[in-house]
Amino acid sequence: MAFDISVNASKTINALVYFSTQQNKLVIRNEVNDTHYTVEFDRDKVVDTFISYNRHNDTIEIRGVLPEETNIGCAVNTPVSMTYLYNKYSFKLILAEYIRHRNTISGNIYSALMTLDDLAIKQYGDIDLLFNEKLKVDSDSGLFDFVNFVKDMICCDSRIVVALSSLVSKHWELTNKKYRCMALANIYLIVFQYLSYLDYDTIYVSIYAGTLRA
């Protein structure tokens, strides 16, 4: 079941992708216009999704393939108690690897790196400074304080987050990970008690989006 979504980079859509060890399923949760969508499928199914930023029409593009047998649920205005979180150390290594080799990379990944150059790296001048001072890591949980990093950006441009998402998605593709997930989301504020069920190899980030067009 292939899908292609284009969103206007102006409003907010919250999304979360995580693996539930309790249910033994990969779960995608989205919130659009106060409506919550949940997609669940078995762990032995391949999910191939990629996020990129289209500079020409200022849109965020999400493309991918879901298994044919996919459970989709919908609930309106469901109250949820939530907290911020982000991923652990591998993300820093992935990003550093691509930045160091950006002169030999082309296509969407090249565009993502150029976006990072424009919106983040040039702000600090030194990528090590960016990592050490801005990507704070909680030593107990191993989670990045990524939300504060985004808020600290001078321009707070959603494109940097989309660029980071693209890099991580592409890394999973190149390393032939079977359970590839979307590297999405204004860190979909996950319910705190579910933290123990999360697979910390899942990536959470923050984007801005608006009207969905399937």
Swiss-Prot record:
Q: What is this protein called?
A: Protein OPG176
Q: How does it assemble?
A: Tetramer. Interacts with host MYD88, TRF4, TICAM2 and MAL.
| GO biological-process terms attached to the record | symbiont-mediated suppression of host cytoplasmic pattern recognition receptor signaling pathway via inhibition of IRF3 activity; symbiont-mediated suppression of host NF-kappaB cascade
Q: Which family does it belong to?
A: Belongs to the orthopoxvirus OPG176 family.
Q: Relate the induction remark in this record.
A: Expressed in the early phase of the viral replicative cycle.
Summary of the function given for this chain in its UniProt record: BCL2-like protein which disrupts the host immune response by inhibiting the TLR4 signaling pathway leading to NF-kappa-B activation. Acts close to the plasma membrane and targets several host TIR-domain containing adapter proteins including MYD88, TIRAP, TRIF and TICAM2. In turn, blocks the host NF-kappa-B and TRIF-mediated IRF3 activation.
Keyword annotations:
Early protein, Host-virus interaction, Inhibition of host innate immune response by virus, Inhibition of host IRF3 by virus, Inhibition of host NF-kappa-B by virus, Inhibition of host RLR pathway by virus, Viral immunoevasion
